[in-house]
Amino acid sequence: METIYQVFVSSTYADLKDERRQVSETLAKAGFVPAGMELFPAADQQQLEFIQRVIDRCDYYVVMVGGRYGSLADDRISFTEREYEYALSKGLPVLAFLHGSPEAIPVGKTDENRAKARKLKAFETGLQPDA
């Protein structure tokens, strides 16, 4: 019997909707089962618990980071970062995609809030292998 792997695809939503779709389609064409926020209603704390149950059933975790930090959970950490931390805690192999030219991201797809921009930068730094 052939093994089918499930991959959780994580990112902020509105600014990376097209990229998420492309990654999910590519994974599906390659024989993987993509899972991600498209399957879930709006984010809240119960949502995070549901997402964690989905991550528990996944074999891999992919995170894409653009110009936004994302919606904050109760502890003021983004849902995307919480998902990433959870995947790490479960020992899932993680593949992170960071925008190669963040300065070229259109203004409408970046955080205007300076506190969120700082959190995004710290999150990006933690995703890099030599960090």
Briefly describe each language-model feature range.
Residues 102-131:
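C-terminal interaction surface of TIR/SEFIR-family domains
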Residues 23, 50-51, 80-83, 119, ...:
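A general structural detector for well-ordered alpha-helical segments in enzyme core domains, enriched
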Residues 42-47, 67-89:
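Conserved TIR/SEFIR loop-to-helix hotspot centered on a Trp-containing motif
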Residues 89-102:
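A short helix->loop->beta-strand "cap" motif at the edges of active sites that frequently abuts
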Residues 1-64, 88-90:
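Conserved N-terminal substructure of TIR/SEFIR domains
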Residues 18, 71-73, 105-107:
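Extracytoplasmic/secreted cell-surface and envelope-processing proteins
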Residues 14, 41, 68-70, 101-104:
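Solvent-exposed loop/turn segments at secondary-structure junctions
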